[in-house]
């Protein structure tokens, strides 16, 4: 696992913004709607607390199928760990299956207060997209985060725009829009470090991408 200093690898739960907004398969959703949707799909278990990921398959997945999916995720994790600027962690989705959380430090992806991807970040996302294309039976969820500098409104907009920049770039590299099931900006509502220090604020500025088994992968594993 690569450690780039300012990179953060955990997702904490905070109150949902009443102005929160995001995108679900291309459509905009408000904070309340996103919260309701997340509750309906199911919340990520373990380190992710509150991030709704995983196909809503509605049935229990057997141990054998779960083990097969775990092996596939472990293989992809090894691929992703070679990407500059990406920190990869195994988490558990709402179906109890292994999933991956890939955290990109916003300092690597974007210039300060900008949502346009840098040339360096595009090189990393090119490799990330290749891994997604080679593992097509997965869904992708993207969250943007900021530190607490500035107003809630400004940070909400920037966090969403950054998440959407990653979404749009991945789609430009051949990732089908239907695979990206949720894109949301969370502003500074889910800090992973103190915003009282420069180091903490840097850790809080990040984009998180979750990779989880879709229904096809689950069906094939059973």
Model region roles, listed by residue range:
Residues 27, 36-40, 59, 75, ...:
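Extracytoplasmic/secreted proteins, especially bacterial periplasmic and envelope-associated proteins
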Residues 16-20:
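C-terminal motif of bacterial Sec signal peptides marking the signal peptidase cleavage site
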Residues 1-11:
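Bacterial N-terminal signal peptides that target proteins for export
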Residues 22-81:
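Short, low-complexity, glycine-enriched hydrophobic/amphipathic alpha-helices that associate
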Residues 73-101:
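Amphipathic, membrane-active segments
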Residues 145-220:
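Periplasmic OmpA-like peptidoglycan-binding domain that tethers envelope proteins to the cell wall
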Residues 84, 96-100, 104-106, 113, ...:
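Envelope-exposed proteins and targeting segments
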Residues 109-143, 171, 202, 209-210, ...:
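Periplasmic peptidoglycan-binding/anchoring modules of Gram-negative envelope and division proteins
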